[in-house]
A protein has these predicted regions:
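Low-complexity, acidic/polar, glycine-enriched regions of mature
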Residues: 1-180
């Protein structure tokens, strides 16, 4: 990674965090693949001379999640649908909590790195892995997948289980690294 050593603060002021869901089941065509933006999140990247001296911590506020789009489905998502999805996430699935991450190791080389660490969702901690890419010009991108059931989270289902949110969700963060 070409980011100079230092401590960097990331969040909505210089980046975007997205959660992307898919759907499955016999009624899957009725639902939507969602893109959810996390409005309140923060991360600190401590960058050393080499990857072994680097660390990453982050936190995301579940209550700040907003559905920004939904692909597929029988009908387009209305603003009311989006509000109901948020209410379900906060009230029935995750609670109005924080999601936390703390790296345990960072490896790789060039413009790519693998960040491994402990992810805590709904009070349960499990290992997680994210791919970090230096996009150039001070831009970075982190991607990873989270299996909800690894954290005791039951993916949403409707129509007696005929429509389900896939257990695996995609996480994507893109940010501009501020000056150290």
């Amino acid at each position: 990674m070409a980011i100079p050593p230092g401590s960097y603060k990331l969040g909505p002021e210089n980046g975007k965090m997205l959660v992307k869901t898919g759907r499955e089941g016999m009624g899957g065509k009725m639902g939507h693949d969602l893109v959810i933006e996390v409005g309140r999140w923060s991360a600190t990247a401590d960058v050393g001379e080499d990857l072994s001296a680097c660390s990453l911590t982050g936190s995301a506020d579940v209550g700040s999640m907003e559905v920004v789009s939904g692909e597929g489905g029988v009908k387009p998502l209305s603003d009311g649908d989006k509000a109901e999805i948020k209410k379900t996430i906060v009230d029935k699935i995750l609670g109005d909590t924080k999601i936390d991450f703390k790296s345990t190791s960072i490896s790789g080389g060039g413009s790519n790195a693998t960040v491994q660490g402990d992810l805590t969702i709904a009070g349960k901690t499990a290992p997680a892995q994210f791919q970090l890419q230096d996009l150039g010009g001070g831009r970075i991108k982190a991607t990873g997948q989270v299996v909800q059931s690894n954290f005791g989270v039951k993916p949403f289902k409707a129509f007696m289980g005929a429509l389900k949110v896939k257990d695996t969700v995609d996480i994507e963060i893109e940010a501009t690294v501020p000056e150290a």
